[in-house]
Regions:
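Sec-dependent bacterial lipoprotein signal peptides
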Residues: 1-21
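Intrinsic-disorder/low-complexity detector
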Residues: 21-203
C-alpha cells in the first residue's frame, strides 16, 4: 500500500483530531506539517479560507506556509470528505457544506446534504417545541402556588377576586398555548419521520 493510500485509509480516524481554530500559535507554525494540515482541513470540508487564516497567522511570526504541500494534502482530504455517502450524515449533524467538492459531484452531494439537513432542522424543531411545552407546564404548576401566595398577601376581598381572575386567565392562556404546541409538535414529528425516511432511502 502506498503512503498516499495509507493516508486515505487513516483519514476517518484523523477527523477526530481536527482543530477547532482557524489560526495557529507560533509553536504550531514552527512545527507545522502543512501536508497533514491540508489533509485534515480537506477531511473537514474546509475552504481555502482556512489556509489563508493559517498562512496569515504564521506570517506574523515569520513562518512561511508551504502552500503546495497544503494543497496536496487538502486534495487527499477532500477525496474522503466528498464521498457521496458522507453528505446526508453531514447535514443530519447540522454541519455545513461550502461547495468544496468537484463540479462533477457537487450537485448530488449538495442534494444529499440538504436531505440530511432536513432531519437536523426538524429534529431541532421538535426539541424547541418540547422545551417550550416543558416551560409552560412549569408555569402551570407554579401558578397554583403563586396564586395562593398572592391571595394570602391581599388585604381586601376585591383584591383577592382580582388575583383569582388574573390567575384563571393566565392558566387558560397557558393551556391554550400548550394545545397549540401539541398540534405543532405532532406536525414536526411527522415531518421529522418523513425527513428520516427520505435520508434512509438514499442508502
Amino acid at each position: 500500500m502506498s503512503a498516499k493510500s495509507r493516508l486515505i485509509a487513516l483519514l476517518p480516524a484523523l477527523a477526530v483530531l481536527l482543530s477547532a481554530c482557524a489560526t495557529m500559535t507560533p509553536d504550531e507554525c514552527r512545527q507545522a506539517n502543512w501536508y497533514d494540515l491540508g489533509a485534515r482541513d480537506g477531511m473537514a470540508g474546509e475552504t481555502l479560507a482556512k489556509f489563508t487564516a493559517r498562512r496569515d497567522a504564521c506570517a506574523e511570526v515569520k513562518v512561511v506556509a508551504d502552500a503546495n504541500g497544503y494543497a496536496r494534502g487538502r486534495d487527499i482530504g477532500l477525496r474522503s470528505f466528498c464521498r457521496l455517502e458522507n453528505a446526508a450524515p453531514l447535514g443530519a449533524r447540522g454541519g455545513s457544506y461550502e461547495g468544496v467538492c468537484p463540479p462533477a459531484i457537487d450537485y448530488e452531494f449538495r442534494r444529499r446534504f440538504d436531505v440530511g439537513y432536513a432531519v437536523y432542522r426538524w429534529h431541532s424543531e421538535v426539541d424547541r417545541i418540547e422545551e417550550r411545552m416543558r416551560s409552560h407546564e412549569r408555569k402551570l404548576r407554579d401558578a397554583d402556588h403563586d396564586e395562593e401566595k398572592a391571595i394570602k398577601a391581599a388585604e381586601r376581598d376585591e383584591d383577592r377576586r382580582r388575583i383569582r381572575r388574573d390567575f384563571d386567565e393566565k392558566r387558560h392562556r397557558l393551556r391554550e398555548e400548550l394545545h397549540d404546541f401539541d398540534r405543532d409538535l405532532h406536525r414536526a414529528r411527522d415531518n421529522l419521520r418523513d425527513a428520516e425516511a427520505a435520508m434512509y432511502s438514499l442508502r
